[in-house]
Amino acid sequence: MAKSLREWIDSEVRDIRAKSMRWLSQYHFFRDPTRPMWSDTSCFFAPADGIILYEKVVAPDDPIVEIKGKPYSLRDALRDESYDKPSLVIGIFMTFFDVHVNRIPFPGRLTYKMLEPIETYNRPMLDVEKTILEELRISMDDAAYLHANQRVVNRVESIQLGQAYYILQIADYDVDSVMPFNLKQHQPYAQGQRFSQIRYGSQVDLIVPLSPRYEFSLKHPPGLHVEAGVDSLIAISETRAQAFACEEVA
Protein backbone atom coordinates (compact mmCIF):
# COMPACT_ATOMS: atom_id res chain seq x y z
CA MET A 1 0.00 0.00 0.00
CA ALA A 2 1.05 3.61 -0.50
CA LYS A 3 3.22 4.96 2.31
CA SER A 4 4.64 8.30 3.31
CA LEU A 5 8.32 8.75 2.56
CA ARG A 6 9.17 8.41 6.25
CA GLU A 7 7.06 5.25 6.65
CA TRP A 8 8.67 3.65 3.61
CA ILE A 9 12.22 4.42 4.76
CA ASP A 10 11.51 3.13 8.27
CA SER A 11 9.90 -0.10 7.07
CA GLU A 12 11.82 -0.94 3.89
CA VAL A 13 15.14 0.94 3.78
CA ARG A 14 16.50 1.53 7.27
CA ASP A 15 17.61 -2.06 7.99
CA ILE A 16 19.59 -2.43 4.75
CA ARG A 17 20.84 1.11 4.22
CA ALA A 18 24.19 0.38 5.86
CA LYS A 19 24.87 -2.61 3.59
CA SER A 20 27.69 -2.29 1.08
CA MET A 21 26.98 -1.39 -2.53
CA ARG A 22 28.31 -4.81 -3.52
CA TRP A 23 25.85 -6.57 -1.20
CA LEU A 24 22.94 -4.43 -2.39
CA SER A 25 23.80 -5.02 -6.04
CA GLN A 26 24.20 -8.77 -5.58
CA TYR A 27 21.39 -9.65 -3.20
CA HIS A 28 18.86 -6.83 -3.15
CA PHE A 29 18.67 -4.77 -6.30
CA PHE A 30 17.58 -7.41 -8.83
CA ARG A 31 14.88 -8.95 -6.66
CA ASP A 32 11.58 -9.64 -8.37
CA PRO A 33 9.00 -10.42 -5.69
CA THR A 34 5.87 -12.35 -6.59
CA ARG A 35 2.84 -10.07 -6.63
CA PRO A 36 -0.83 -10.76 -7.32
CA MET A 37 -2.10 -9.47 -10.66
CA TRP A 38 -5.14 -7.44 -9.69
CA SER A 39 -7.75 -6.83 -12.37
CA ASP A 40 -9.61 -3.59 -11.75
CA THR A 41 -10.37 -1.54 -14.82
CA SER A 42 -11.80 1.28 -12.72
CA CYS A 43 -8.23 2.48 -12.18
CA PHE A 44 -4.67 2.72 -13.45
CA PHE A 45 -2.19 0.96 -11.18
CA ALA A 46 1.33 2.26 -10.58
CA PRO A 47 3.75 1.16 -13.33
CA ALA A 48 6.76 1.32 -10.98
CA ASP A 49 7.85 1.19 -7.36
CA GLY A 50 9.01 4.59 -6.17
CA ILE A 51 8.26 8.09 -4.95
CA ILE A 52 5.66 10.24 -6.71
CA LEU A 53 7.64 13.31 -7.83
CA TYR A 54 4.89 15.22 -9.59
CA GLU A 55 1.37 14.77 -10.96
CA LYS A 56 -0.69 17.24 -12.95
CA VAL A 57 -2.75 17.84 -16.06
CA VAL A 58 -0.76 19.73 -18.68
CA ALA A 59 -1.12 20.91 -22.26
CA PRO A 60 1.42 19.40 -24.68
CA ASP A 61 3.81 22.37 -24.58
CA ASP A 62 3.20 23.53 -21.01
CA PRO A 63 5.86 22.71 -18.40
CA ILE A 64 5.42 19.60 -16.28
CA VAL A 65 8.24 21.00 -14.16
CA GLU A 66 10.88 23.69 -14.52
CA ILE A 67 14.48 22.66 -13.94
CA LYS A 68 16.58 25.67 -12.98
CA GLY A 69 14.32 27.87 -15.10
CA LYS A 70 14.18 25.51 -18.09
CA PRO A 71 10.69 24.13 -18.78
CA TYR A 72 10.18 20.40 -19.35
CA SER A 73 7.01 19.60 -21.29
CA LEU A 74 5.20 16.51 -22.57
CA ARG A 75 6.73 17.12 -25.99
CA ASP A 76 10.16 17.19 -24.37
CA ALA A 77 9.42 14.03 -22.39
CA LEU A 78 8.19 12.06 -25.41
CA ARG A 79 10.56 13.86 -27.83
CA ASP A 80 7.63 14.34 -30.16
CA GLU A 81 6.83 17.87 -31.34
CA SER A 82 3.61 16.61 -32.92
CA TYR A 83 2.13 15.40 -29.62
CA ASP A 84 -1.08 17.41 -29.24
CA LYS A 85 -3.10 15.90 -26.39
CA PRO A 86 -3.63 17.52 -22.98
CA SER A 87 -2.67 14.76 -20.56
CA LEU A 88 -2.48 13.68 -16.97
CA VAL A 89 1.14 12.91 -16.12
CA ILE A 90 2.56 11.23 -13.01
CA GLY A 91 6.32 10.95 -12.43
CA ILE A 92 7.68 8.15 -10.21
CA PHE A 93 11.31 8.16 -9.07
CA MET A 94 12.76 4.69 -8.50
CA THR A 95 15.53 4.75 -5.89
CA PHE A 96 18.31 2.18 -5.64
CA PHE A 97 16.31 0.49 -2.86
CA ASP A 98 13.18 -0.04 -4.96
CA VAL A 99 12.12 -3.09 -6.96
CA HIS A 100 12.98 -2.17 -10.54
CA VAL A 101 10.49 -4.37 -12.37
CA ASN A 102 7.82 -2.36 -14.20
CA ARG A 103 4.21 -3.47 -14.65
CA ILE A 104 1.30 -2.57 -16.93
CA PRO A 105 -1.09 -0.06 -15.29
CA PHE A 106 -4.11 -0.82 -17.52
CA PRO A 107 -4.58 -3.70 -20.01
CA GLY A 108 -3.78 -3.15 -23.66
CA ARG A 109 -1.44 -3.84 -26.56
CA LEU A 110 2.09 -2.46 -26.16
CA THR A 111 4.51 -1.02 -28.69
CA TYR A 112 7.72 0.73 -27.76
CA LYS A 113 10.57 2.79 -29.15
CA MET A 114 13.98 3.45 -27.66
CA LEU A 115 15.35 7.00 -27.80
CA GLU A 116 19.05 7.60 -27.35
CA PRO A 117 20.50 10.22 -24.97
CA ILE A 118 20.65 13.74 -26.36
CA GLU A 119 24.22 14.14 -25.12
CA THR A 120 27.10 11.66 -25.30
CA TYR A 121 26.25 10.24 -21.88
CA ASN A 122 23.26 10.00 -19.62
CA ARG A 123 23.20 12.41 -16.69
CA PRO A 124 23.16 10.93 -13.16
CA MET A 125 20.08 10.91 -10.93
CA LEU A 126 21.99 10.53 -7.68
CA ASP A 127 21.43 14.08 -6.38
CA VAL A 128 17.65 13.73 -6.67
CA GLU A 129 17.83 10.39 -4.84
CA LYS A 130 20.01 11.82 -2.05
CA THR A 131 17.57 14.66 -1.45
CA ILE A 132 14.71 12.16 -1.19
CA LEU A 133 16.50 9.71 1.12
CA GLU A 134 18.52 12.10 3.27
CA GLU A 135 16.32 15.20 3.46
CA LEU A 136 12.92 13.53 2.96
CA ARG A 137 11.90 16.05 0.34
CA ILE A 138 11.55 16.34 -3.42
CA SER A 139 13.66 18.81 -5.38
CA MET A 140 13.74 19.00 -9.17
CA ASP A 141 16.73 21.36 -9.25
CA ASP A 142 19.06 18.50 -10.20
CA ALA A 143 16.68 16.75 -12.60
CA ALA A 144 18.47 17.75 -15.82
CA TYR A 145 18.40 14.05 -16.72
CA LEU A 146 14.76 14.54 -17.72
CA HIS A 147 15.84 16.51 -20.77
CA ALA A 148 18.95 14.55 -21.64
CA ASN A 149 18.80 10.86 -20.82
CA GLN A 150 18.05 7.77 -22.85
CA ARG A 151 14.44 6.64 -22.59
CA VAL A 152 11.89 4.13 -23.81
CA VAL A 153 8.45 5.37 -24.85
CA ASN A 154 5.90 2.58 -24.36
CA ARG A 155 2.54 3.15 -26.05
CA VAL A 156 -0.31 1.01 -24.75
CA GLU A 157 -3.44 0.89 -26.91
CA SER A 158 -6.54 0.16 -24.84
CA ILE A 159 -9.68 -1.09 -26.56
CA GLN A 160 -11.71 -0.57 -23.41
CA LEU A 161 -10.71 3.09 -23.06
CA GLY A 162 -10.80 3.70 -26.80
CA GLN A 163 -7.40 5.40 -26.69
CA ALA A 164 -3.72 4.93 -25.99
CA TYR A 165 -1.68 5.90 -22.95
CA TYR A 166 2.08 5.99 -22.39
CA ILE A 167 4.64 4.60 -19.97
CA LEU A 168 7.90 6.56 -20.19
CA GLN A 169 11.01 4.83 -18.81
CA ILE A 170 14.01 7.12 -18.24
CA ALA A 171 17.40 5.55 -17.65
CA ASP A 172 19.97 6.66 -15.08
CA TYR A 173 23.68 7.22 -15.79
CA ASP A 174 24.18 3.75 -17.31
CA VAL A 175 23.12 3.51 -20.95
CA ASP A 176 21.09 0.58 -22.32
CA SER A 177 19.73 -0.11 -18.85
CA VAL A 178 16.07 -0.41 -19.86
CA MET A 179 15.43 -4.07 -20.59
CA PRO A 180 12.04 -5.14 -22.05
CA PHE A 181 11.13 -8.72 -21.18
CA ASN A 182 9.59 -9.24 -24.63
CA LEU A 183 11.30 -7.62 -27.61
CA LYS A 184 8.32 -8.19 -29.92
CA GLN A 185 6.09 -5.25 -30.78
CA HIS A 186 2.26 -5.04 -30.55
CA GLN A 187 2.04 -7.55 -27.72
CA PRO A 188 -1.05 -7.82 -25.47
CA TYR A 189 -0.52 -7.31 -21.74
CA ALA A 190 -2.81 -7.82 -18.77
CA GLN A 191 -3.14 -5.29 -15.99
CA GLY A 192 -0.30 -5.74 -13.51
CA GLN A 193 1.77 -7.92 -15.86
CA ARG A 194 5.56 -7.49 -15.81
CA PHE A 195 6.88 -5.97 -19.03
CA SER A 196 10.33 -4.48 -18.37
CA GLN A 197 13.13 -3.78 -15.92
CA ILE A 198 15.39 -0.74 -15.45
CA ARG A 199 18.79 -1.14 -13.84
CA TYR A 200 19.78 1.10 -10.93
CA GLY A 201 18.28 4.56 -10.36
CA SER A 202 15.61 5.52 -12.85
CA GLN A 203 12.27 7.23 -13.40
CA VAL A 204 8.97 6.06 -14.87
CA ASP A 205 6.20 8.44 -15.95
CA LEU A 206 2.59 7.49 -16.62
CA ILE A 207 1.03 9.74 -19.28
CA VAL A 208 -2.72 9.48 -19.89
CA PRO A 209 -4.32 11.72 -22.54
CA LEU A 210 -7.58 13.29 -21.38
CA SER A 211 -10.73 11.65 -22.70
CA PRO A 212 -14.23 12.87 -23.63
CA ARG A 213 -15.60 9.55 -22.35
CA TYR A 214 -13.86 9.21 -19.00
CA GLU A 215 -12.77 11.32 -16.07
CA PHE A 216 -9.35 10.56 -14.57
CA SER A 217 -8.91 11.44 -10.89
CA LEU A 218 -5.65 11.36 -8.95
CA LYS A 219 -5.62 9.16 -5.85
CA HIS A 220 -2.35 10.05 -4.08
CA PRO A 221 -0.39 13.27 -3.49
CA PRO A 222 3.28 13.76 -4.45
CA GLY A 223 5.76 12.47 -1.90
CA LEU A 224 4.12 9.10 -1.29
CA HIS A 225 5.84 5.81 -2.04
CA VAL A 226 3.86 3.42 -4.27
CA GLU A 227 4.33 -0.13 -5.56
CA ALA A 228 3.89 -1.34 -9.14
CA GLY A 229 0.71 -3.31 -9.73
CA VAL A 230 -0.37 -2.83 -6.11
CA ASP A 231 -1.28 0.83 -5.62
CA SER A 232 -3.85 2.51 -7.86
CA LEU A 233 -2.82 5.96 -9.07
CA ILE A 234 -5.77 7.12 -11.16
CA ALA A 235 -9.49 6.44 -10.68
CA ILE A 236 -11.49 6.08 -13.90
CA SER A 237 -15.15 7.07 -14.15
CA GLU A 238 -17.51 7.89 -17.00
CA THR A 239 -18.08 11.53 -17.75
CA ARG A 240 -21.61 12.81 -17.20
CA ALA A 241 -22.09 13.17 -20.95
CA GLN A 242 -21.01 9.58 -21.55
CA ALA A 243 -23.21 8.24 -18.75
CA PHE A 244 -26.20 10.20 -20.12
CA ALA A 245 -25.56 8.85 -23.62
CA CYS A 246 -25.47 5.29 -22.29
CA GLU A 247 -28.78 5.85 -20.46
CA GLU A 248 -30.35 7.19 -23.67
CA VAL A 249 -29.25 4.09 -25.61
CA ALA A 250 -30.58 1.81 -22.87
Model-identified regions with their sequence ranges:
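Contiguous, well-folded functional domains in the mature portion of proteins
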Residues: M1-A250
